[in-house]
């Protein structure tokens, strides 16, 4: 099967996050930030300093390299271990056009340290956060990476590797890893109105008549392609580990997803036991309205009680994400690992890296106590209009191209 082939390919040589439902057939301008915090923002932009950038990136590199590393500043340069230096580029004092013009060969005028901060912190997205799509998400087309045509380039990883080579360092952990995840939008094949709506999505949105036909054919058999047990069996067969994100409640009708976790408590508990039997993780698929409703902690507690396990992993439904608010919500709710940060309509490196990292808190000038595991490839992303003309084999090839870059 395509999914099984893809999983093995990922595990062979990939460090990053990959998501497929298993329940679908893969392949199935001016800065105008809208709010201020006294003393932290100027002209609607984060008030940054060279010291902020230096400290954050020094901590980041310490997590990656086995050898000690120290960054100091002197005469307009970042100096690493008194061995190599990079000119300081104060990107926070530049306008959009300057940033776009000054970025060449994966850096802003040769400043590797500032460039790594720019991408890891999501600075461009943070300062353009008023731009939203119909679901309140920042569009990939408005990202700096998309405007420069580098969304499929792991800029941070490229620069870190250059630094490692120049210093002659080694990585603490250089073994390939795949973070395989499943968003459990549904517990089984939809029926009734939900079934017909899914056919409409297949035909009108995904432009995939064959997928709709297969869905109809499956509805007349006992073979349920939406069964979570199918995913569990796949992990059991291949000896792989998966993370399963369960929804905490039914979603609004226009979002068509979710289920009553109390009503399906026994079924979910049985699922949870099976997932644990293959060393899988159980996480939360955040309510689509989590940015509007102050209930994530309650949702986590509900799932934790049902599955009798601590819920520390999460991802947002529809990849709903607001860089000015989401990390705060995750941190306060007790989420330790999030894997939301990808664009719904494009594969690639939203934060410039395939590796886990701690996001930056612009308000308090510190790292969040949350690890972001970048979502690099999601099945639905390859159903977007950007890839509409690609056939199945070409979509697999697109994923292989991404893998070869990390």
Question: Where are the model-predicted features located?
Answer:
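Terminal accessory/targeting
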Residues: 1-263, 353-356, 362-406
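Catalytic domains of cell-wall/extracellular-matrix polysaccharide-remodeling enzymes
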Residues: 14-33, 289-366
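Conserved, mostly hydrophobic/aromatic
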Residues: 183, 285, 314, 330, ...
